[in-house]
UniProtKB/Swiss-Prot annotation:
Residues 36-68 are annotated as: Hypervariable stalk region. Catalyzes the removal of terminal sialic acid residues from viral and cellular glycoconjugates. Cleaves off the terminal sialic acids on the glycosylated HA during virus budding to facilitate virus release. Additionally helps virus spread through the circulation by further removing sialic acids from the cell surface. These cleavages prevent self-aggregation and ensure the efficient spread of the progeny virus from cell to cell. Otherwise, infection would be limited to one round of replication. Homotetramer. Its EC number is 3.2.1.18. The gene is NA. Its main location: virion. The active site is at D129 (proton donor/acceptor), Y380 (nucleophile). Belongs to the glycosyl hydrolase 34 family. Disulfide bonds join C70-C395, C102-C107, C162-C209, C211-C216, C257-C270, C259-C268, C296-C313, C399-C424. This is Neuraminidase.
Length: 447
């Protein structure tokens, strides 16, 4: 074979290989296109079916709220966020009024920020309760509230939130003292508003609302903090107010109620800032038929308060002025009472079981569990529950949180903030101890 023939032969072979390669590439492209078309068709078919499936799933996890409280013998620690300790060096919000609420999937800590971070100049003067900079935000329970793990919820200086099994209802009150408005959101979208009806600091729970079979319930107060005010229960469905009822409660004072569902009804234990050192309560059903009273026990739950003694099923006037947000859990004629250890300052915390304290006025009790030592600061406290849809139990698990306030007015700082701890009721071994905030003050910004 002469050189020219060799060249032609080699070229022909190369061209043949190239054509075969091209054909294979074209086949590969066609195969990929066909495969993608099949996948897209399947995906579209799946998405077309998915909404009904998702709707069924959502409906199946609606929180029924008809279970009774779980029987318990004590309280197991559930969370501690150490927000102030972490905030001395990290980016942590200046907050107050934290509370916890759970869906069927998770528990979250809600809190009212001051639009500022700890150890920053904007934390100056944050002892003030109501300002246009305050917002309701939330983060996973047990985490320090920071810009990196928190969700904005609402502009608010008073708030509540709860999950009905299908979405979050949030209530944020903001505006001037003489005309504030509560903005209701459902899954983040504004659904309704409630205007102050007495033009005197409309305010709500500072803890979770209560949901029963798709309806959620909250209590609001409007009027004097040291005299007769007006109190309303609101029934809310998918963020819309469907019914309300004003309490006929002369000589009663309800503020900052801690509410929970129990056997298909709602029980709220509140703060009397007017003239009671024991706590007022209101219970109601889904039709807003209600009953009212005061916890009768001589183990008093408010702060300030007198030493334990003889209680009353009406307001106990001794040391009855002012008060602090708190809670109790009713078990028949018995009651678990959460309270500060100090009778005069917001320090220490303990849980007490009075087996007949809901209806009887003596001061005997059978269980006391230490939560925070009297030498450490505490603050507000409130209840929350974990529904059977979350826990897998056949009962409603009672839980509570305690705010650990630091800064002004008890420390030489320019700021006021807090961290939080929480506990849940169990019918197994528990321990009493002290779980304080633990931050060393003052911070760099204070010096």
């Amino acid at each position: 074979m002469n050189p020219n023939q060799k060249i032609i032969t080699i070229g022909s072979i190369c061209m043949g290989i190239g054509i075969i390669s091209l054909i294979l590439q074209i086949g590969n492209i066609i195969s990929m296109w066909v495969s993608h078309s099949i996948q897209t068709e399947n995906q579209n078919h799946h998405e077309a079916c998915n909404p009904s499936i998702a709707g069924q799933d959502a409906a199946s996890v609606a929180l029924a709220g008809n279970s009774s409280l779980c029987p318990i013998s004590g309280w197991a620690i559930y969370s501690k966020d150490n927000g102030i300790r972490i905030g001395s060096k990290g980016d942590v919000f200046v907050i107050r009024e934290p509370f916890i609420s759970c869906s069927h999937l998770e528990c979250r800590t809600f809190f009212l920020t001051q639009g500022a971070l700890l150890n920053d100049k904007h934390s100056n003067g944050t002892v003030k309760d109501r300002s246009p900079y305050r917002t309701l935000m939330s983060c996973p329970v047990g985490e320090a509230p920071s810009p990196y793990n928190s969700r904005f919820v609402s502009v608010a200086w008073s708030a509540s939130a709860c999950h009905d099994g299908m979405g979050w209802l949030t209530i944020g009150i903001s505006g001037p003292d003489n005309g504030a408005v509560a903005v209701l959101k459902y899954n983040g979208i504004i659904t309704d508003t409630i205007k102050s009806w007495k033009n005197n600091i409309l305010r709500t729970q500072e803890s979770e609302c209560a949901c029963i079979n798709g309806s959620c319930f909250t209590i609001m107060t409007d009027g004097p903090s040291n005299g007769q005010a007006s109190y309303k229960i609101f029934k809310i469905e998918k963020g819309k107010v469907v019914k309300s009822s004003e309490l006929n409660a002369p000589n009663y004072h309800y503020e900052e109620c801690s509410c929970y569902p129990d056997a298909g009804e709602v029980m709220c234990v509140c703060r009397d800032n007017w003239h009671g050192s024991n706590r007022p309560w209101v219970s109601f059903n889904k039709n807003l038929d209600y009953q009212i009273g005061y916890i009768c026990s001589g183990v008093f739950g408010d702060n300030p308060r007198p030493n334990d003694g003889t209680g009353s099923c009406g307001p106990v006037s001794s040391n009855g002025a002012y008060g602090i947000k708190g809670f109790s859990f009713k078990y028949g004629n018995g009651v678990w009472i959460g309270r500060t250890k100090s009778t005069s300052s917001r320090s220490g915390f303990e849980m007490i079981w009075d087996p007949n304290g809901w209806t009887e006025t003596d001061s005997s009790f059978s269980v006391k569990q230490d939560i925070v030592a009297i030498t450490d600061w505490s603050g507000y406290s409130g209840s929350f529950v974990q529904h059977p849809e979350l826990t897998g139990l056949d009962c409603m698990r009672p839980c509570f949180w305690v705010e650990l306030i630091r800064g002004r007015p008890n420390h030489n700082t320019i700021w006021t903030s807090g961290s939080s701890i929480s506990f849940c009721g169990v019918n197994s071994d528990t321990v009493g101890w002290s779980w304080p905030d633990g931050a060393e003050l003052p911070f760099t910004i204070d010096k």
